[in-house]
Curated annotation (Swiss-Prot):
Gene source species: Streptococcus pyogenes serotype M49 (strain NZ131)
HAMAP family: Leu_tRNA_synth_B
Protein's recorded name: Leucine--tRNA ligase
EC number: 6.1.1.4
Keywords: Aminoacyl-tRNA synthetase, ATP-binding, Cytoplasm, Ligase, Nucleotide-binding, Protein biosynthesis
UniProt-annotated location(s): Cytoplasm
Record-listed ATP binding positions: K613
Lineage: Bacteria, Bacillati, Bacillota, Bacilli, Lactobacillales
Primary localization class, coarse: cytoplasm
Length: 833
């Protein structure tokens, strides 16, 4: 039996592509463009795992498909190479993070090239290259000049173990850090902020213009969190102080029985009475140790302290005790709420716990038992009584505005983006703080502000980054003799990844971020493939920067990514015990088709789980490429199931994909190829061209491969294979298995040219229709024969053919035919006696 040798074929074609710059981006202005973008990886020390190539293979298939369809294709790759892991490694080992990163990139690039992806490596970018981050810094200076980058004393999410503050988006639901899982505490610090809130409405509205999964759009909508309601001003009794509350339900103001301020609210100390001062100070201290997520957890026990003061409800003059509680955040809304315990679960629980008044203002429910959170007509509400929700809100807003104690208001949950990190391994923020109290941006002519090389990269612990220790870099003097210090904070990893897709378009430009004409030619990105875990962070930040650049006239489109696709996760083989705990694969043995714990003998259930070192179920693509070949890995990952589904890795599935490719190789290299078309494969070939073309376009790669298998099965039944169909089939499979595609193309054509730019095959619609049809012949209602006849024969012709059939003649010999019923294209029924 013939098998192909992937160890010879794959390196041969990889060298051919590299030597001939086969995948250099096309520049023919008469052709349509296609920009296929992968989320570029962070080059970790662990290298690629088999999850990475799933998305990369999808964009590669599309890129090869579009090249063959006559498009200029931009399909680049680069490295998101700043970030904490390299710095952590450097601190642990004493090595330079730049050297460590360069080694990791070389390893990633080797692995990626071994998988046969058609990247244009002339466009490679690296976020740690000063020629790249010059423009990251330039974007920052533009944000600064526009007032969109500013310094503020803000409570930050401080992670002691990392020695840095992190953004809200980087705090996990359990209140630990996304990176490392460390405890997060709130701590006030001077920080750089980016005013993403100025773009909240546009970030929301323009989601309508992009072809993204609805689930991702919803995550962004929820994160932006637009609310329409009213601001209401409450005066503090016996003082000249007041505070503002934002509420989406101003119609329930008659039911507000107490107010709650965030412990950090500026008014707290001023209105706290002497009797309550100690309790309030204690409570504030405890609250500062909790993350926002821990504080707002709905399930946690309600805690709070009364300030000793009262607010006056503006609508009825009632006195409302003012409390502080950690479930109210200073960073959200106004940092103060009016509590309507009859109609809000959290307020109800708080009121019950601290014995506060509960006054129902909506009809329905029993507020002694539980908060009534549905809609109802208004009661106990004076001029709102009997009104429904919408009418009551409108009337109350009108009253508030007329009385000068409130106004209609739109708010957003979105907070400004905490942009500074107290770390070494990041882009220096190009700002100088002068001793006269002013700050200026480093001028463009002096960019890039290069990150200095230093051995001392441990966090200072003072809230400054290790750059504070590099004196000769840190201290500067102006021409007029005024001394200054450079900003010591660095940018977060999100900075370089917020605009990298623009640099691929013009990666070697030293004068500007990218040429305007090239940006017009290539934007927006046509397809962006990556994990759904980036729904809020990266995708929101990139959209924000893109909109700023649009306002600056740098980019011609409002949105960066026209279509987004999230590939699923490839899960590892793993096992669970009876308690549901996962068991590492090296603790499992297989006996008689079942799985058992080596140490306890307990029978285990096979259960796919995320690949992890601890479960010892991480699959290294290097091993797969060595044993089965890159084409097998590519075909297997595309054939596993729908691209957006999470599916378990299977060695059997991998072997099945390899067997299929061996069958393809045998079909083309051992079957007699002929210039004469017998017509036997007309229908299946044309169906295959049509199906694969449509399914690749729709990213339904698994069904495209299934159709290729149908063709192979049909072709194997024939003695000879028509040359045009052999070539067309090889073109169809080449985007999935490019090395094999090139090898078989040469076997058929000996052209010496790559298959990459050979025009994509077309199909003949007329061949999709069967000219013959199978009919059944029934005698006495039982099927006696099946006949293949020309389509659309008349009743008379059908009757003739049926009666002339040998089997039928044997059945009716010596019998009287009473009648013959012929139904064209279906059946002939013969009645005899």
């Amino acid at each position: 039996m013939t098998f192909y040798d992937h160890t010879a074929i794959e390196p041969k074609w990889q060298a051919f592509w590299a030597d001939n710059h086969t995948f250099k981006t096309g520049t023919d202005a008469s052709k349509p463009k296609f920009y296929a973008l992968d989320m570029f990886p962070y080059p970790s020390g662990a290298g690629l795992h088999v999850g990475h190539p799933e998305g990369y293979t999808a964009t590669d298939i599309l890129s090869r498909f579009k090249r063959a369809q006559g498009h200029n294709v931009l399909h680049p790759m680069g490295w998101d190479a700043f970030g904490l892991p390299a710095e952590q490694y450097a601190m642990d080992t004493g090595n330079d993070p730049a050297e460590f990163t360069a080694e990791n990139i070389a390893n990633f690039k080797r692995q990626i090239n071994a998988l046969g992806f058609s990247y244009d490596w002339d466009r490679e970018v690296n976020t740690t290259d000063p020629n790249y981050y010059k423009w990251t810094q330039w974007i920052f200076t533009e944000l600064y000049e526009k007032g969109l980058a500013y310094e503020a004393e803000v409570p930050v999410n401080w992670v002691e173990e990392l020695g840095t503050a992190i953004a809200n988006e980087e705090v996990l639901p359990d209140g630990t850090s996304e990176r490392g899982g460390y405890p997060v505490v709130r701590k006030p610090m001077r920080q750089w902020m980016l005013k993403i809130t100025a773009y909240a409405e546009r970030l929301l509205e323009d989601l309508e213009e992009v072809d993204w999964p609805e689930s991702i759009k919803d995550m962004q909508r929820n994160w932006i969190g637009k609310s329409t309601g009213a601001n209401v001003t409450f005066k503090v009794k016996d003082t000249d102080k007041d505070f503002t509350v934002f509420t989406t339900r101003p119609d329930t103001l008659f039911g507000a029985t107490y107010a709650v301020l965030a412990p950090e609210h500026a008014l707290v100390d001023a209105i706290t009475t002497a009797d309550q001062a100690e309790a309030v100070a204690d409570y504030k201290r405890q609250a500062s140790l909790k993350s926002d997520l821990a504080r707002t957890d709905l399930a946690k026990e309600k805690t709070g302290v009364w300030t000793g003061s009262y607010a006056i409800n503006p609508v009825n003059g009632n006195e409302m005790p003012v409390w502080i509680a950690d479930y109210v955040l200073a960073s959200y809304g106004t940092g103060a709420i009016m509590a309507v315990p009859a109609h809000d679960e959290r307020d109800w629980e708080f009121a019950k716990q601290f014995n506060l008044d509960i006054i129902p203002v909506l009809e329905g429910g029993n507020v002694e038992e539980a908060a009534f959170t549905e809609d109802g007509l208004h009661i106990n509400s004076d001029f709102l009584d009997g009104l429904d929700k919408a009418s009551a809100i409108a009337k109350m807003v009108e009253w508030l505005e007329a009385e000068g104690v409130g106004n209609e208001k739109v708010t957003y949950r979105l907070r400004d983006w905490l942009f500074s990190r107290q770390r070494y391994w990041g882009e220096p923020i190009p700002i100088i703080h002068w001793e006269d109290g002013t700050s200026t941006a480093v001028p463009e002519s002096e960019l890039p502000l290069v990150l200095p090389v230093t051995k001392d990269i441990r966090p200072s612990g003072t809230g400054e980054s290790p750059l504070a220790n590099v004196t000769d870099w840190l201290e500067v003097t102006r021409e007029d003799g005024v001394k200054g210090r450079r900003e010591t904070n660095t940018m977060p990893q999100w900075a370089g990844s917020s605009w990298y897709y623009l640099r691929y378009i013009d990666p070697h430009n030293t004068e500007k971020l990218a040429d305007e004409e090239l940006l017009k030619q290539w934007l927006p990105v046509d397809i962006y493939v990556g994990g759904a875990e980036h729904a809020v962070l990266h995708l929101l930040y990139a959209r924000f920067w893109h909109k700023v650049l649009y306002d600056l006239g740098v980019v011609p489109t409002k949105e960066p990514f026209q279509k987004l696709f999230n590939q699923g996760m490839i899960l590892g083989t793993s096992y669970r015990d009876s308690r549901g705990a996962l068991v590492a694969t090296d603790k499992v043995e297989k006996r008689d088709g079942s799985f058992f714990h080596v140490e306890t003998g307990e029978e285990l259930e096979q259960a796919p789980a995320k690949m992890s070192k601890s479960l010892k179920n991480v699959v290294n693509p290097d091993d797969v490429v060595e044993q089965y070949g890159a084409d097998t890995l590519r075909v297997y990952e595309m054939f596993m199931g729908p691209l957006d589904a999470s599916i378990a890795w299977s060695e059997e599935g991998l072997e099945g994909s390899r067997k299929f490719l061996d069958r393809v190789y045998r079909l083309i290299t051992t079957k007699e190829i002929t210039e004469e078309n017998s017509g036997a494969l007309d229908k299946v070939y044309n169906e295959t061209v049509k199906a694969v073309t449509e399914q690749v376009d729709q990213m339904k790669f698994n069904t495209a491969i299934a159709q290729l298998m149908v063709f192979v099965n049909a072709a194997n039944k024939e003695d000879k294979l028509f040359s045009d169909y052999a070539k067309g089939f090889v073109q169809l499979i080449a985007p999935f298995a490019p090395h094999l595609g090139e090898e078989l193309w040469q076997a058929l054509t000996a052209s010496g040219e790559s298959i990459s730019y050979v025009p994509w095959p077309s199909y003949d619609k007329s061949k999709l229709v069967e000219n013959d049809v199978e009919i059944v012949v029934q005698i006495k209602g039982k099927v006696k024969a099946k006949l293949v006849v020309a389509k659309d024969l008349s009743r008379e012709e059908l009757q003739e053919v049926a009666l002339a059939n040998e089997k039928v003649q044997a059945e009716i010999a010596g019998k009287d035919i009473i009648k013959v019923i012929a139904v064209p294209n279906k059946l002939v029924n013969i009645v005899i006696k």
